[in-house]
Every structure is written in structure tokens, then in C-alpha cells.
Swiss-Prot record:
This protein's name: Uncharacterized N-acetyltransferase BALH_3551
Pfam families xrefs: Acetyltransf_1 (PF00583)
Start and end residues of each N-acetyltransferase domain: 9-147
Keyword terms of this UniProt record: Acyltransferase, Transferase
Top-level taxon: Bacteria
Name of the top EC class for this enzyme: transferase
Disulfide bonds: none
GO molecular function, one term: acyltransferase activity, transferring groups other than amino-acyl groups
Species, as recorded: Bacillus thuringiensis (strain Al Hakam)
UniProt KW Transferase keyword: yes
């Protein structure tokens, strides 16, 4: 068995069965199942779902969506990622799998917005996400570091 890695999940009935193992918080769990079912029906091959398999079973998952914003009502302007429904099965929590998923999203080098679940503020703080409060609700954002030492081909010519 190799080291677990993050991969884009296929939209199929096997993934649907794997999702049923996750017992999230109420309607949020159901919406992820319904979302996957809708993608199966529409034969949508561009899956927004990412996960980690361990021993042939899905143990952690998230949804990742590319969005655009004009700057209001929060501090991200332009293209960013929305990270939703990050969940790790109870027997695999506190082993770094949630962090692996978030680091995968960070590696795409876009700002990230997420809505923290109850009692997860410490997790997002540890991963350098900043809390943001707006009239519609609270969430966390992460911005990629800008490397000012990077020289483009045009600048070096």
C-alpha cells in the first residue's frame, strides 16, 4: 500500500457509496450526496470533489470550486477557490489528512475561501487562514504568498 495522496474523485456510483460513510452535520452532508447524484445524472466529468484513499477506501474528502469576485463583500478580488465540506472519517482524524487536502488546494496558488465548521477555527488558524466577518456570515481566507524575487523572462532580457 503506497502513501496516500490527494486525487480528483470520479463521478460514479462507487464514489456515491463511499460518500455514504461520511456522517457530516445534518443538511450539509445530504447536499454533498445530492450534488454528486446530480453530477452523475448530468454525466458531468469535471468533478469538484477531491479525496484521499487509504487501503482502497475513501477516508477524507472536500469540494473545490473555482470562482470570481469583484472584491465585495470580502477581501478576495479576481479568481479564487471555494473549499467546502472538508471531512475526514473519525478513525483517521488528527493524522494530517485534512491538512493534506488543504495543502493540495493551496498548491493551486489561488486565494481560498472556506466556511469553518463548528469547533474548527484552530485548524484553519494553524494553516494560516485569516478570519473574515461580513454581514452575511463569517468565513476564513488564505492568500498565496507573493514571491517578489521571481524574475520573468521579459524582466531578465
Amino acid at each position: 500500500m503506497g502513501f496516500p495522496k490527494v486525487e480528483r474523485l470520479l463521478i460514479n456510483y462507487k464514489t456515491l457509496d463511499e460518500f455514504k460513510k461520511f456522517k457530516g452535520c445534518g443538511a450539509q452532508e445530504l447536499s454533498m450526496l445530492e450534488e454528486l447524484q446530480a453530477n452523475i445524472i448530468e454525466n458531468d466529468s469535471e468533478s469538484p470533489f477531491y479525496g484521499i484513499y487509504y487501503g482502497g477506501s475513501l477516508i477524507a474528502r472536500m469540494s473545490l470550486y473555482m470562482k470570481r469576485n469583484g472584491g465585495e463583500p470580502f477581501e478576495i478580488t479576481g479568481t479564487y477557490l471555494e473549499l467546502y465540506k472538508l471531512e475526514v472519517l473519525p478513525n483517521f482524524q488528527k493524522q494530517g489528512f485534512g491538512e493534506m487536502l488543504v495543502n493540495y488546494a493551496k498548491g493551486l496558488q489561488f486565494p481560498i475561501k472556506t466556511i469553518a465548521r463548528i469547533h474548527s477555527a484552530g485548524f484553519w488558524d494553524k494553516l494560516n487562514f485569516q478570519p473574515v466577518s461580513v454581514p452575511d456570515g463569517d468565513f476564513y481566507v488564505w492568500h498565496p504568498e507573493v514571491n517578489l524575487n521571481t524574475v520573468t523572462n521579459e524582466e531578465s532580457a
